[in-house]
Design a protein with these regions (language model features):
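Specific transmembrane alpha-helical segments of multi-pass solute transporters/efflux pumps
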Residues: 1-17, 22, 56-58, 134, ...
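Hydrophobic/small/kink-forming positions within alpha-helical transmembrane segments
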Residues: 1-4, 26-31, 57, 80-83, ...
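Hydrophobic/aromatic residues within transmembrane alpha-helices
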Residues: 9, 35-37, 41, 92, ...
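Membrane-interface helix-cap regions at the ends of transmembrane helices
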Residues: 1-4, 52-67, 107-129, 175-182, ...
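Helix-helix packing/entry segments at the starts of transmembrane helices
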Residues: 18-24, 89-107, 141-176
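Transmembrane alpha-helical segments that form core, pore/gating elements
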Residues: 29-30, 64-120, 133, 146, ...
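Loop-to-transmembrane alpha-helix entry segments
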Residues: 19-22, 38-58, 65-72, 176-199
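C-terminal-most transmembrane helix of multi-pass membrane proteins
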Residues: 61, 164-217
Length: 217
């Protein structure tokens, strides 16, 4: 559901708005982890989330003119979905991670096939698009597998905090003229991205200075 909502969101609004919605994952995850896993969040992690919040607000004010209600709703749905995914990974650590990702991919395939069939669209694409689809599927699958492996050692809130690198990287990639998108980020997006980067660096330094995971009190 999270992946499907992400696709619908990014096709109905700008990449910046979609990624801003995903940047809210640490907040949803922290709340869900506290309610269902009883994971207490340390002060340092809350500081990182607060710094990231500043960046998100700055980026949001700079992208309001591009906002789409449908895209925003799907973006929030995707954010909540990925938060639930992160919490469930922590909830059942013994669950085979590769199996979880494989089942999720199969579910996405079935839904996509149904949508294509209902809209009477072709299952075939050009060689260029097919290559892009393959590259996309490989990278997303690899990312989810690594994300799942990391969930064994890192608390849920911290796991999604690290995933904020996707917000910075995503906005950068759609800006590159190489891919033909050339979606130029606004000044607010750049400044907000800097705050997100600072929050991640702060968290990384704290984790390096402390041998144990400080989020688990």
């Amino acid at each position: 559901i999270a992946m499907i909502s992400f696709i619908y969101s990014i096709t109905n609004t700008s990449a910046a708005i979609t990624l801003l919605c995903l940047a809210a994952m640490p907040f949803f995850t922290a709340l869900l982890a506290f309610l269902f896993l009883k994971e207490r969040i340390s002060t340092n992690v809350w500081v990182s989330i607060f710094i990231a919040t500043i960046g998100i607000v700055i980026m949001a004010f700079g992208n309001t003119e591009k906002n789409s209600v449908i895209g925003f709703i799907f973006g929030i749905t995707s954010s909540i979905g990925f938060s639930v995914f992160s919490v469930t990974l922590r909830w059942r650590k013994e669950t085979p991670k590769f199996t979880t990702v494989a089942i999720a991919g199969l579910f996405c395939f079935i839904v996509a096939a149904l949508v294509i069939s209902i809209n009477k669209q072709s299952f075939f694409a050009t060689s260029y698009n097919s290559a892009m689809f393959s590259l996309h599927g490989t990278l997303v699958c690899l990312g989810l597998i690594l994300y799942s492996i990391g969930s064994k050692a890192i608390p849920a809130a911290e796991l999604t905090l690290l995933s904020l690198t996707e917000v910075i990287g995503g906005i950068f990639w759609v800006w590159l003229p190489l891919f033909g998108i050339n979606e130029i980020p606004s000044t607010n997006t750049i400044v907000g991205g800097f705050f997100l980067f600072v929050s991640i660096v702060y968290y990384s330094l704290i984790m390096r200075w402390n041998k144990r995971y400080i989020a688990l009190n």
